[in-house]
A protein has these predicted regions:
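Mixed-charge, low-complexity intrinsically disordered regions
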Residues: 52, 80-89
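Intrinsically disordered, low-complexity regulatory segments enriched in Ser/Thr/Pro
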Residues: 26-51, 110-129
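Charged, amphipathic alpha-helical segments
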Residues: 1, 16-17, 73-82, 99
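Mixed-charge, Lys/Arg-enriched low-complexity segments
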Residues: 40-79, 124-154
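Amphipathic, interaction-prone secondary-structure segments
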Residues: 3-34, 89-116
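Short, Φ-rich (hydrophobic/aromatic) sequence segments
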Residues: 1-5, 84-88, 146
Length: 154
């Protein structure tokens, strides 16, 4: 299986993005299911995780069977949901343009997140989740403007 050779897998289910992770501990591997919004669910085996964790009332094992794993070149990775997941869960920096201006989302090791633009304006937030909830460009939320953005890197 994929997680035996890789440490994580990001997939899409019902337009939301999720991550399965394999982590080494003192007692062997632990497996985590990570959503953009909720606390991660962790179990001692992938089987336990798939049999005990639900997504909107559906067992994870059934979710995985219906999930899409887009190619990295697929434009779905530039959607608001994918970018928010990758920034929030994986700490990825995001570079995008909106109406001719360049913006980027960055993070510190301490967990703070920033939305900056090419005129040295910066909005600081205590977390990436807070950034995606409260950041504004021209008075609009990131979710509201995302359809007009061009993603350069995520």
């Amino acid at each position: 299986m994929y997680l035996q050779q890789h440490t994580f897998l990001v997939f899409c289910y019902r337009s939301e993005f999720y991550t399965l992770e394999r982590r080494q501990s003192l007692f062997g591997f632990r497996y985590r299911f990570v959503t953009t919004e909720a606390m991660p669910q962790q179990r001692n085996s992938l089987e336990e995780l798939c049999e005990q964790v639900c997504v909107d009332g559906t067992l994870l094992m059934n979710v995985i069977q219906q999930a899409a794993i887009p190619e990295w070149s697929d434009p779905v990775w530039e959607t608001y949901e994918a970018v928010r997941h990758n920034a929030t869960v994986h700490g990825r920096e995001i570079h995008f343009s909106y109406r001719g201006r360049d913006y980027w989302i960055s993070h510190t090791k301490e967990g703070r997140s920033y939305l900056s633009d090419d005129f040295d304006n910066m909005q600081a937030f205590g977390s990436c989740r807070e950034l995606f909830e409260n950041a504004r460009i021209n008075g609009n939320t990131l979710k509201d403007i995302w359809g007009e953005t061009i993603v350069d890197a995520c």
